[in-house]
Amino acid sequence: MTAPNEKLADSLAALQVLQKGGQRVFQSKDLDRLHRERLLRNGFVQEVMKGWLISSSPSAREGDSTPWYASFWEFCARYCQERFGDDWHLSPEQSLLLHAENTVIPTQVVIYTPRGTNNVVKLLSGTSIYDLKQPDMPPAADVVVRDGLRLYSPAAALVKVPEAFFNRYPIESQVALTSIGDPSDVLRRLLDGGHSVVAGRLAGAFRRIGRPEVADEIVAAMKGADFTVRETDPFAAQQTFGTLRPATAPIVGRMQAMWQAMREPVMAVFPKMPGLPKDRGEYLKFVDEIYKSDAYHSLSIEGYSVTPELIDRVRAGGWDPDHHDDDRKNRDALAARGYWQAFQAVKASVSEIIAGANPGTLTRGAHRDWYRELFQPCVAAGLLRAGALAGYRNDAVYLRTSRYVPPRWEAVRDAMPALFDLMEHENEPGVRAVLGHWMFGYIHPYPDGNGRMARFLMNAMLASGGYPWTVVRVEDRNGYLSALDSASIDLNIEPFAKFIAERVQWSMKHQGDAAKNAGRA
């Protein structure tokens, strides 16, 4: 008789065949009944709806949306292809959001298709697909395929989206408008369709974001074809725009637009800058003193079980993986040792920053050293391959339970230099600290350690204004993560800015008290 573990191994082997190439979505018919039931029972797959499965993990908690969000767009692509063949595409609104690197999982995806039934298909975690019946498919030139999803091209989508889109999604609209290098693609569709009202709207939009030459070209071409055009501005009056260079990579344009939009809300709540410390030794002494608290809270936020005693042992050099198996194998001890090593590297960077180095320029290279120190103990212990220290991720990552999905790994190579450009040219240390922290997590450039790295970066940026090293406490974890989610999903930075500002104010008071006590001594 075959043992249960052998049966499960056979089922996992069948699943592995289907997962080749990174596939996470399958039809039930792809697995025979016994394999399917066994994998469902053991949590290795999850049912989305009748006939469809996604890869899951036995360790996923009940109600955990992470496996679903990780599979969402692949499911949409495979389900629609199976049901509609090539006769479908996403709505112009969703197409533009994806072109503008808005990676938030929507609660509902609208599919345009001649084979639609105007029905809602309910999916997991409160999401759904709505198949909107359309008389015809758009011209082939209007549709592009990306990761299996059939999207309107940016030019076609801009002509199709309603005026309300520009008001609701100003950042995505600016990124999409900026992606249009030459206006010919947009003009051709406006002229062929006789879209004089849309032409006026797009002319107003291009002029508002700082591209008057495109606006003038649209108006002149439409009038030359005997259309009456009245230019209108579709954006809200209070919306402000920085200048983006045409044909900028969408992720870079998005980051620049978000940074510009979020600067003022951060400055409105952040405490006054103390200025670079006169006594750099005293500043660094405070950094040393706060290490124990910082390590405990930062590691605990990430789910490590780290005690103050373990932190003290690591700091005192009592961690010895060469002679103690427990130290070599203990995940928490390895994390604590890596944090100690990285903290020393960050402190060295802070020392240069308070001496006057440009923090954006310095951390552009130094953050790679921090990361290597953070995970070097895990590599030395054999828990990670040496390649883990190579640099940025080359695969997708997902945030547990969050509808926000970090950018595609291909976009990280453009995003990270852009982040350091923004910090390099930013004059306000508080803005560098808050937006640097949030945007590092938004990009999520590494396979692991992004939260710790973001907090290190925040403290390096705080140092550039003379603010003290600031600890995010584990007891504030839920509010902290909720504020980050609000910024990433709703582009509302205010909760996160207020959260960090309050922690910085506490740290300033604590540093001041420590200085007074030292003076009495």
What are these regions (language model features)?
Residues 1-33, 40-50, 56, 60-521:
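FIC/Doc superfamily catalytic core
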